[in-house]
Design a protein with these regions (language model features):
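Metal-dependent nuclease catalytic cores that hydrolyze phosphodiester bonds in DNA/RNA
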Residues: 1-139, 246, 250
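Generic alpha-helical secondary structure signal
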Residues: 8, 21-23, 39, 95, ...
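A structural signal for alpha-helix termini and helix-coil/disorder junctions
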Residues: 90-94, 120, 185, 228, ...
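Generic preference for flexible, low-structure residues
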Residues: 100, 104, 207-210, 238, ...
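Mg2+/Mn2+-dependent nuclease catalytic core
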Residues: 126-232
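Charged phosphate-binding loop/patch that engages nucleotide di/tri-phosphates or the phosphate backbone
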Residues: 221-250
């Protein structure tokens, strides 16, 4: 076990799991994000959820604020989220990091708020920015796998422009449920909970958890979305009269 010291406290790293590496690439045929693991290409969890979600709310929001403003907000939020994740990743690894850009100055206090409140119960961590996959089905990258209040946990960090309501984050729950299933299948673990840590630019912190029966229910809901995704892909191939490749069935 290695021990790191950062921001006034130590975080232990455990080598309990030997994680398989994967490469994230863009599939040129579909233009979607896929993971290349053990010579297989798997759709990402975010691609699956994005392709099967109800787009009506997004359409209404774009109509309200305008296409250009919607793109500006989306790009700014994405950049801020990327920077916040970098701060958190380096904190967990125990390595120094700073971002002196205006985006970085927004993201840094948000990351510190998550460190101060969200990561306080973390006793040890197994992996940061871990590529996980369920062979033949899907893959993705989770922000943190750790021991949180005595439970093996999948953690996802999220930035948000405003506080979240439970009913707005169903895809977040399905995301951590998908990662938990993949981790358990490949590594023989028993992930007990998923924790979503959210912070806004005005430093409002929220935490959402799924464990036990609730986590199982989110797993089932993700599997339904996975079925929908494959149905959509099959329909697209039939319409295009594309012959399915052998690897589609692996």
């Amino acid at each position: 076990i290695q021990e790191y010291h950062n921001i006034g406290r130590s975080i232990k790293r455990s080598e309990k799991y030997n994680y398989i590496s994967g490469k994230q690439i863009t599939d040129h045929e579909s233009g979607t994000r896929v993971y290349e693991i053990n010579n297989y290409r798997l759709p990402s969890v975010t691609t699956i959820l994005g392709a099967t979600k109800n787009q009506e709310f997004i359409k209404q929001w774009k109509a309200k604020v305008g296409e250009a403003e919607a793109d500006r907000i989306k790009n700014h939020s994405s950049s801020r989220g990327t920077s916040m994740h970098k701060f958190l990743e380096h904190y967990i690894l125990g390595t120094g990091y700073d971002d002196l850009t205006s985006i970085g100055q927004e993201a840094s206090p948000m990351a510190k708020k998550i460190i101060e409140i969200g990561l306080a119960p973390v006793e040890e961590w197994y992996g940061s920015e871990v590529t996980l996959h369920y062979p033949g089905l899907y893959a993705g990258s989770t922000d943190l796998v750790c021991l949180h209040n005595g439970m093996e946990t999948i953690v996802d960090f999220k930035q948000s422009n405003r506080p979240k309501r439970e009913e707005w984050i169903e895809d977040y729950y399905m995301q951590i449920a998908a990662y938990a299933m993949a981790h358990d299948y490949v590594y023989g673990s028993k992930i007990q909970q998923g924790v979503i840590m959210v912070c806004t630019p005005d430093l409002y912190y929220q935490e959402f958890k799924a464990e036990g029966l609730q986590l199982r229910q989110w797993k089932h809901r993700f599997l339904k979305r996975l079925d929908m995704y494959h149905d959509l892909k099959n329909d697209e191939k039939e319409k295009a009269n594309v012959k399915m490749k052998e690897e589609d069935f692996k």
